[in-house]
Structure formats: structure tokens, C-alpha cells
């Protein structure tokens, strides 16, 4: 399918990589302030410093939990995690386990902000990992072929692999459920992440439930087409409602027989990862009307010069 810049919908892959490899808790706090990846830092091979901004160009200068950082889609937190990883390579390896070819992922720190062109199919396929206990299962479109006598002459076989440790995956599911904010008429567990790109040209939303994963992109066929403001052009306003309405309509359709008792899989025993972050939240930072935030990845088209 057509590939477009995915924006903040890519951030959960950066978070997942850090939690999976470094064992960082969603409750660990990070400073919402300018972060610079400089020449000589890690294996980024930059030739000049890179200091991306939040969408508003403002910083709270407050300590935010990882969980809150994802909900508020703070670019600063995502870049901090990328710097912590020391290289884009761990993230590229992670998404490769989720079905996205490494050839599509630039070897650049700006992938932390979603400076990547991918298709809705590729993104939705990768997000199924979160809804499936960290297991990526290759999407298939044709289940089987039968001849005119009803005899099966072809049956598809979908490969699968464990991309995320179950404990790390459940932490991500918990964070995505927290991040979703407004959920419309959808009943039962749901999580998700919005995405908005430069000049408000692309709006994304990836939604996960125990039964179904739905992804959508909204934008113009030509990249120069954009909405005139972030308020109108953010994924939370133009892409997310489509997914919520679609899932709600499926739940209301008796023919679908939606399983309202289904829950995201939680590994048995102790997770070893703290998820209850209430004691760490800063009560002085207000939510907007629907509890959502969208920090679009500004200036990511102005890439730093990279070495060979």
C-alpha cells in the first residue's frame, strides 16, 4: 500500500524496545526538557547536534513518567529513550520482529519521532503484536481455497514469532490503554496511539482491542495537501474517531458476536515491572478536554547530516 510518514504512532515501538531491553518501568520518570543527541553520542554518527522540539515548542520542565510521556506524546521523552538505547539499531531490530522490513527504517535518531514512511498495512500488522501477547503473526488475506466440490485445495499458513517478552508487552498494553483517553462508544478494553506529521498533512490512529486491531490514516493523496492547523489536522481529531466509530459499530452488530468478556493477556505471576504510576503523576499538569495530547514531530524533515 501507499506509504506515508507515520508520526507519533511509531513511538510505542521505541518505548517497547526500551522496556524490553533495558527493563525500564513505565513509572520511571524523565524530564520534559530539550534533549540533544550530539556528535560522538552512542552510535548515531551525527555530524551536528540534533535537538528536536515538542509540537508546541514548549516544555513543562517537569518530571513525567514514561506512561505519561506516551499519553502526552512528548517528543522529548521519546528522544531521551532513543539516546538511552545508544543507537537506532535496537528499534530497527524490534520492528523487524514485528513484520516491518529494516530496509524501510532509516538509521537515524529521528525515527524516535516517526520520521518514517510506512503503510497502514505495515503499521497495523506491527500493532497486532501488542494485542497478541508480544507475538507477531504475519497477516494473511486468503485463508483457503476450495474447489467446486468443497474440497480444500489450498490453506494458508501464517508464520509467527515472539517479538516482545510477555511482561514487556503487557506493560505496553497497559500504557496504550492509558494513552487512548477519549474512547467514544467503544465498550471493553481498548488502547491506541495517535500520530500527526509535519504541516498537519497526515493523521493516524492505531487502535488495539483483545478482539481486533484497527489502523487508519487520513490525508491527501498529494503530500502538499494539509490541514490549516494542528487543532484540525491532528490524528486525534481526524483519524481516531473513524476507528472508534468502526469498532463501536462492530460491537453493536449482533452478527459479529463480539466477545465482550475478552481481556488483553496478562502473564501469570509477578511481572517484575511496576505499572501503577499514580504516586508519580504530577497533578499540576492539566489535561485538555478529552484527556489527549498530540505533539507532532516538528522539524524532523530537517535531518542532521549523517556520516557514512
Regions found by a protein language model. Name each.
Residues 97-153, 157, 163, 191-199, ...:
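Active-site-proximal helix/loop microenvironment
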Residues 4-32, 69, 126-130, 172, ...:
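Active-site SXXK
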Residues 34, 38-40, 45, 49-53, ...:
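Soluble, non-transmembrane domains of envelope/secretory-pathway proteins that act on or interact
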Residues 1-10, 115-118, 235:
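Gly/Ser-rich catalytic serine loop of serine hydrolases
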Residues 24-91, 136, 148-178:
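Conserved catalytic neighborhood of penicillin-recognizing serine enzymes
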Residues 20-21, 60, 74-77, 118, ...:
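Short, glycine-/Ser/Thr-/acidic-enriched flexible segments
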Residues 170-197:
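Active-site Gly/Thr loop motif
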Residues 24-32, 136-140, 181-190, 250-264:
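Acidic/polar loop patches that form or flank catalytic/metal-binding clefts of enzymes
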Amino acid at each position: 500500500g501507499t506509504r506515508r510518514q507515520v508520526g507519533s504512532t511509531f513511538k510505542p515501538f521505541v518505548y517497547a524496545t526500551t522496556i524490553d531491553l533495558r527493563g525500564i518501568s513505565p513509572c520511571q520518570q524523565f524530564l520534559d526538557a530539550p534533549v540533544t543527541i550530539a556528535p560522538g553520542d552512542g552510535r548515531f554518527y551525527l555530524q551536528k547536534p540534533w535537538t528536536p522540539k515538542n509540537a508546541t515548542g514548549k516544555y513543562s520542565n517537569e518530571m513525567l513518567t514514561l506512561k505519561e510521556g506516551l499519553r502526552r506524546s512528548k517528543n522529548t521523552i521519546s528522544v531521551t529513550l532513543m539516546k538511552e538505547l545508544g543507537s537506532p539499531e535496537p528499534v530497527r531490530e524490534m520492528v523487524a520482529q514485528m513484520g516491518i522490513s529494516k530496509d524501510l527504517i532509516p538509521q537515524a535518531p529521528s525515527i524516535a519521532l516517526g520520521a518514517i514512511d510506512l503503510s497502514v498495512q505495515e503499521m497495523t500488522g506491527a500493532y497486532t503484536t501488542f494485542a497478541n501477547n508480544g507475538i507477531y503473526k504475519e497477516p494473511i488475506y486468503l485463508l483457503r481455497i476450495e474447489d467446486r466440490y468443497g474440497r480444500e485445495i489450498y490453506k494458508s499458513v501464517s508464520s509467527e514469532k515472539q517479538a516482545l517478552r510477555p511482561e514487556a508487552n503487557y506493560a505496553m498494553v497497559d500504557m496504550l490503554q492509558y494513552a487512548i483517553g477519549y474512547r467514544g462508544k467503544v465498550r471493553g478494553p481498548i488502547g491506541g496511539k495517535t500520530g500527526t506529521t509535519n504541516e498537519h498533512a497526515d493523521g493516524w490512529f492505531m487502535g488495539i482491542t483483545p478482539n481486533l486491531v484497527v489502523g487508519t490514516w487520513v490525508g491527501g493523496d498529494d503530500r502538499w495537501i494539509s490541514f490549516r492547523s494542528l487543532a484540525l489536522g491532528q490524528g486525534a481529531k481526524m483519524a481516531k474517531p473513524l476507528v472508534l466509530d468502526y469498532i463501536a459499530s462492530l460491537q453493536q452488530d449482533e452478527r459479529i458476536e463480539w466477545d465482550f468478556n475478552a481481556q488483553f493477556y496478562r502473564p501469570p505471576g509477578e511481572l517484575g515491572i511496576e505499572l501503577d504510576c499514580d504516586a508519580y503523576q504530577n497533578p499540576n499538569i492539566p489535561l485538555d478536554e478529552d484527556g489527549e495530547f498530540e505533539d507532532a514531530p516538528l522539524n524532523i524533515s530537517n535531518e542532521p547530516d549523517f556520516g557514512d
